[in-house]
Amino acid sequence: MNVFEPRLSSWLENAGDDDDVVLSSRIRLARNLKDEQFPVYEQKEEIVDNIAEVFDDNFTLIKMNQISLLQKALLVEKHLISPYMMNKSEYGAVLLNEEENVSIMLNEEDHLRIQCMTPGLRLFDALEAALQIDGYVEEKLSYAFDKEFGYLTSCVTNIGTGMRASVMVHLPGLVTTKRIKSVIEAIRSLGFVVRGIYGEGSMPASNIFQVSNQVTLGKTETEIVEDLTQVMEQIIMQERVARTTLKQKFHIALEDRVFRSYGLLMNCRIISMKEASDAISDIRLGVELGFFEHISRQKMNELVLFSQPAFLRREAGRDMDELEEKVIRAKVIREILGDK
């Protein structure tokens, strides 16, 4: 297993329910050990070793103090660790399975953060996988748990189930029809959070948004997932309506925009992250509307991931200035799109 190779994780490579709109679903469980201090102010490497011993050879342990900053950034871009772990968790580590759809962060904000990812809208599948791992760990290690408050976590907003359920969605139709603001306001009024592609603190890119639950106390894991699934079903329906409206009422203008973006990416020699993200979103929309039969969703996911800064530095084999990064990005994008 070489997680640093330029390949898609299984949750970005395989098909899933409603994957014309939904890229992926994720369940994350935050847990702390009963007899250890948290928040993790004094990050103890022995905590990592003790937890890692619980897992078998199906998982690979990667310690943050044994890899380079570039390798950490690659893990962030693949959504396998958080930006927090990359920047602040010197004695942190991550356990990964071969498919890269299970990532267990150790000594991040909490002792364990178990996250399971699935393609499309499959929150219940992700929940089942996460709870199975959680139960396995709890048989061998004692969690910090309170009968009244539930699982105790470093951040009070995670107390209770300790669960964050999130869905990554592509919403170009709602953005183009200028309905995205009202949709986000409606989502927030229902107690959910809308963030960028890399979660808290990140901005949307390629018209990709992340929707997650805010409440973790007072509801069961199943109830939270049911509520989020219902919200996502409404968002999916509204996005599809917006796409249909664009295709029916503004077909020529839409087709022109999509093919201009395709021409840009096929022929560019210098391109910024913002310009590439906008064009990739246009082409992904074109793929879903049937404009490009030769381009798969998998190829679109490759464009998003492999045009990120860390993957470009890996491709170049060195650090680059801003212009060099734009040149390498253009080259990588042309190669991906040209490989039919």
UniProtKB/Swiss-Prot annotation:
Task: Show where the Phosphagen kinase C-terminal domain sits.
Answer: 21-242
* Class in the EC hierarchy, top level: transferase
A GO term from the CC aspect: extracellular space
Protein name (record): Protein-arginine kinase
User: Which GO BP terms, alphabetically?
Assistant: phosphocreatine biosynthetic process
| Disulfide linkage | none
What InterPro entries does this protein map onto?
A: Arg_Kinase, ATP-guanido_PTrfase, ATP-guanido_PTrfase_cat, Gln_synth/guanido_kin_cat_dom
PROSITE patterns in the cross-refs: PHOSPHAGEN_KINASE_C
Listed EC numbers: 2.7.14.1
| Function according to Swiss-Prot or TrEMBL | Catalyzes the specific phosphorylation of arginine residues in proteins.
